[in-house]
Regions:
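Structured catalytic-domain cores with a bias toward divalent-metal coordination
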Residues: 3, 15-501
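Bacterial N-terminal signal peptides
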Residues: 4-12
Length: 501
């Protein structure tokens, strides 16, 4: 019934304006007085096609003689499309430019994001000094098959932003291969979010719609060292300030969730399945930027694209302004001595959120119980190992295809170690309907012999190894079913707390 009320409300306010926001769209989301030259703005219908995006990048060095653009082929998608990237430098780059990764359209229905990425590139290259201080690796369409059909998922039906950890989708395998080669110091992932949701019909008398232009998703994962989380927060604050100067409204990312039949909010994130956390676990300043847009057609398109670029530019400018500070933070994060947190306490708090009330056609504030990921508190922490050692026989085809352990060496060991013995185990379904195993393990001293894949905590991405090998964590090899287990048995990998013999 509430769906019908929401639909009638939208018709009532729509007037002669286009798009779901109707007549109040121009009030709350007016377009800025700027010129944007990306492909979508050279036509009156639709968004930039993959071909138009590629042509635009091919012509960048003509429009910007100060730019050097190298096309990078990441690979070929299941539907035979080329996944393309572009490595961009200024004409006179410094000796050690800040490496910045930029991507869009990981979800194929978020169709304005490639133009946001292109407009960001325009802004960077328009400032020759800035362009010479950074090196960009740009993947404007990270899900070409989904983008061609304006569908969120990949050709195989996978949500690629729930697959960043296990990398079962070939798209993520290709992305992470180039990502790891590039080794970015800053990583930006541009998304769009849906401002009209079915659960929003339960708020207010006739439902609400989203008020914020952009929402930031950094990471509150406590296995990311605190020094890096604080640096990411500083970048987000600077970007929010830059957006506000243009009248764009920003907020930390929040989304409704069910709590035993009642609605509460989830504020922030900590999941390594998603780029925001996963890229930060690779030891870089990482943020996912959500822009109000899915289901909006071309409504407020200039505002959407420009706000993405302004936010991205703030990240680029801050990194370029003091690269020594950025690198000192990343070095401190890599050397952080804290071991893996395997159990957390997450308190519930009350917070108020601003929406656009469809009955009042004005803003309104509503209170909700909230799971605030920024307030998570470590409850159980294991010591930091020097190495993890995976029995070579456990290196399954799925694990090999993921590329997670592609650069690790194999050694014959006779070594003291701590085994993980399974004390509890339950099964369920996780992201992309994949089977999961939830376990609790105890560590047992043992001596291991044989051939093992060695993962050193001195090697990047060291904090990613926590997420993979600590079995209790939500995105571990065990939780995702890549390592089978049973109660009373030991897992086929070990933590080593001393130098290897």
């Amino acid at each position: 019934m509430r769906w019908g009320i929401l639909a009638l409300g939208l018709l009532a306010v729509s007037g002669t304006s286009s798009g779901p926001d109707g007549s109040f769209g121009a009030v709350f989301f007016p377009d800025p007085a700027v010129e944007i030259l990306t492909p979508a703005f050279q036509k009156s219908k639709g968004f930039s096609s993959e071909e138009e995006v590629t042509q635009w990048f091919d012509q960048v060095s003509i429009r910007f003689p100060n730019a050097s653009v190298q096309r990078v082929k990441l690979g070929t998608t299941p539907r035979g499309r080329i996944m393309g990237g572009f490595r961009i430098n200024g004409s006179n780059p410094g000796a050690n430019p800040v490496r910045i990764w930029v991507q869009g359209a990981l979800h194929g229905d978020e169709q304005a994001t490639p133009d946001g990425v292109m407009h960001l590139v325009e802004m960077v290259l328009s400032d020759q000094e800035l362009a010479n201080r950074v090196e960009l690796m740009v993947v404007p369409i990270a899900n070409p098959d989904g983008y061609a059909r304006a569908m969120r998922q990949s050709a195989s039906g996978m949500d690629l932003n729930r697959d960043m950890m296990m990398r079962q989708g070939p798209e993520n395998q290709m992305i992470m291969s180039v990502f790891n080669e590039f080794r970015p110091e800053v990583a930006l992932d541009f998304h769009e979010y849906r401002p009209y949701r079915s659960d929003f019909t339960e708020i207010g008398s006739r439902g609400v719609t989203a008020y914020f232009d952009n929402m930031f998703l950094g990471s509150s994962n406590v296995n990311i060292p605190e020094v890096l989380r604080a640096e990411i927060a500083a970048y987000v604050d600077g970007a929010a300030t830059a957006a506000a100067q243009w009248g764009y409204r920003t907020h930390a990312y929040f989304v409704p969730e069910d709590d035993r039949g009642s609605m509460r909010m989830r504020l922030g994130s900590a999941s390594s399945r998603s780029t925001a956390t996963n890229y930060a676990l690779h030891n870089c300043v990482s943020a996912l930027i959500e822009t109000r847009g899915v289901g909006q057609g071309r409504s407020a398109l200039k505002r959407r694209v420009h706000s993405m670029a302004i936010i991205g530019l703030a990240f680029v400018q801050k990194a370029a302004a003091d690269p020594d500070h950025l690198r000192a933070v990343l070095d401190a994060a890599h050397r952080d001595p804290m071991g893996p947190v395997i159990e957390l306490h997450q308190p519930i708090e009350q917070r108020r959120y601003t929406f656009i009330d469809l009955a009042k056609r004005d803003t309104a504030s509503f209170g909700f119980a909230t799971r605030n990921y920024a307030q998570m508190q470590p409850r159980v922490r294991r010591p930091k190992p020097k190495f993890y050692a995976l029995d070579k026989s456990a290196l399954t085809p799925e694990l090999i295809r993921s590329g997670l352990l592609v650069n690790q060496e194999t050694k014959s060991l006779n070594q003291k170690a701590m085994a993980y013995e399974v004390a509890q185990r339950t099964e369920g379904l996780g992201a992309n309907n994949q089977r999961t195993q939830k376990v609790v393990c105890t560590q047992v001293p043992t001596t291991i012999t044989g051939d093992f894949v060695i993962i050193s905590m001195d090697d990047l991405p060291s904090r990613l190894w926590y997420e993979l090998f600590e079995p209790e964590l939500d995105n571990s090899l065990v939780r995702n079913g890549l390592i089978e287990c049973s109660i009373g048995k030991q897992l086929p990998y070990y933590a080593i707390y001393e130098e290897i013999n």
